[in-house]
Amino acid sequence: MTFTKKNVSVSQGPDPRSSIQKERDSSKWNPQQMNYFLEGSVERSELMKALAQQMERDPILFTDGSYYDLTKDQQRELTAVKINRIARYREQESIDTFNKRLSLIGIFDPQVGTRIGVNLGLFLSCIRGNGTTSQLNYWANEKETADVKGIYGCFGMTELAHGSNVAGLETTATFDKESDEFVINTPHIGATKWWIGGAAHSATHCSVYARLIVDGQDYGVKTFVVPLRDSNHDLMPGVTVGDIGPKMGRDGIDNGWIQFSNVRIPRFFMLQKFCKVSAEGEVTLPPLEQLSYSALLGGRVMMVLDSYRMLARMSTIALRYAIGRRQFKGDNVDPNDPNALETQLIDYPLHQKRLFPYFVPPMSSPSVPSRLNTPSRPPWSNWTSPLKRTTPRLIFKSIDDMKSLFVDSGSLKSTATWLGAEAIDQCRQACGGHGHSSYNGFGKAYNDWVVQCTWEGDNNVLGMSVGKPIVKQVISIEDAGKTVRGSTAFLNQLKEYTGSNSSKVVLNTVADLDDIKTVIKAIEVAIIRLSQEAASIVKKESFDYVGAELVQLSKLKAHHYLLTEYIRRIDTFDQKELAPYLITLGKLYAATIVLDRFAGVFLTFNVASTEAITALASVQIPKLCAEVRPNVVAYTDSFQQSDMIVNSAIGRYDGDIYENYFDLVKLQNPPSKTKAPYSDALEAMLNRPTLDERERFQKSDETAAILSK
């Protein structure tokens, strides 16, 4: 048959590529300059770009769409191969640079980042936080653990029956004076170490949290280094290890379970920076044992950075798709005009309100870890130095510093990881059916991400743990007239905004909503009044009755920290021409992520007027979205995430969403393979004989006639 114009319609297909380029050309500023703000400095920005390019060009570390088709076993093997490769980089660069490399790996291949992080982060941080200088030097340097060589550690805290309640762990470490050894034992199934990353196949050693028992007395949970495998990688006697199996995500991590059956370790394998046990069985406890839990805080700080890099990646995909995707012709377009374009998804106000809030937090986040380690608040590894002296003032200063970081890191970790999980799914939904395709990145990102909401502190439990000291501080101010220091010093304004001043409104008008510093003040007042309300309940009942309020306080504290830090950074940023755009983003964050979500709190405690909250939805948020809209592509470009890091067919830089998507689908699922591997089953179903044939016609009329004679 010859095709002619009479029987074939030829029309121009969609051209999303030109849409994104048009927006890029109309940008008001250079995304690279914005990236300097995002990363905190020109030097850091250039370093991150160089590290990303290095891994893109590395044939082993490079990741593409085939990543989404890997089985569990393939993920495990590939992860091990990548760790072997990454270890070579560790040999040649500083730990600070290597940590930045890991933060990038955590975006595009989080299971690789986690498996390395368990060794360098959790295992070594436990030794750094709980071991002596000599112990740290031995395990980290002499045994080359810090170079990902010789020893590969895992972190043995959680058990099958205990997670959040660390003090309730039941693995035992009983001191044997005669042999000068500890006997590590799993007394029952509930004490089985569980979810231990790296235990199933990789780890040679484990930092085990176990109950110290000397002469029959239980001294609580301490930490011990326990060898799991020998130099041939065979299990040590008495050590039983198993694989937990498939998980919701991060199957490249060999999470395992461990049981110890009277495993003996030398006394000096106990980490003894704080608690010490002599050969005679004398136990020396530290002045304040809270310091021994500082090892976990570093991971929480880095998870904040992970959260916002993931937010940047997910919002980049959804926003680039929303620019190229068109659906429905607007009312101002002739529906019969064949050349009239449909409306870009990005131009629908609802779409803007759904997506715009998620690319704002990444603008303030990369500096958070370094900010939490400023000279005024030294790294957690330095807090224990005052213990070498006997000055009570210095000891309590260390405790105050750690408590302050606990509040900040805990509130930020829980709030940021929750926001990350929410953002991934909202961005997926905003991409319609195509968001459901693995090749567009959302599915694996979500499955890999949500564990962040429960590990290293379950977010609800962590939220309550953060809210509790805030309420206690309010009680100490209210009942004892004490003064609070640190990041919650604003609680000292208690009398100014409670009692006879409890009706003092902070946000009265749209102008108030439009001033970030006024919003920050409103958050402080909301925290003060909510804390006082919770305190009144606690005095009558207990903290168990205010769990929801404590979590709310934790979230508000996180937003207070981020907005305060964001404004501080804008004020000190030397690219002043970008300040108006950054301030607009800050206003959008305050309006959507804070005020809109916590409107009930602000209204209940008279922090905001009804008029202000009404104007928030009808005036402020639509206005800010309209201001942000022209530069959406530039904002996503400012994250400087390459196509490899984004790893999404519909999220590539060129914006050619349909061609890229279709090409990847065909590459990974060749259309030349017209029959499925299970085609025999399908054909057997379709071509099966009739029921009469399968019954050999034994029930036919002819058979009946024969058998009835």
Swiss-Prot record:
Localisation: Peroxisome
Assigned keywords, A-Z: FAD, Fatty acid metabolism, Flavoprotein, Lipid metabolism, Oxidoreductase, Peroxisome
GO molecular function: acyl-CoA oxidase activity; FAD binding; fatty acid binding
Claim: Cytoplasm is one of the keywords in the record: no
E.C. number(s) listed in UniProt: 1.3.3.6
Annotated GO CC locations: peroxisome
Catalytic activity reported: a 2,3-saturated acyl-CoA + O2 = a (2E)-enoyl-CoA + H2O2
Region (Disordered): 1-29
Main location: other
Requisite cofactors: FAD
Disulphide-bonded residues: none
Bias (Polar residues) ranges: 1-12
Gene3D superfamilies: Acyl-CoA dehydrogenase/oxidase, N-terminal domain, Butyryl-CoA Dehydrogenase, subunit A, domain 2, Butyryl-CoA Dehydrogenase, subunit A, domain 3
Protein family: Belongs to the acyl-CoA oxidase family.
Protein's name in the database: Acyl-coenzyme A oxidase 4
Biological source species: Candida tropicalis
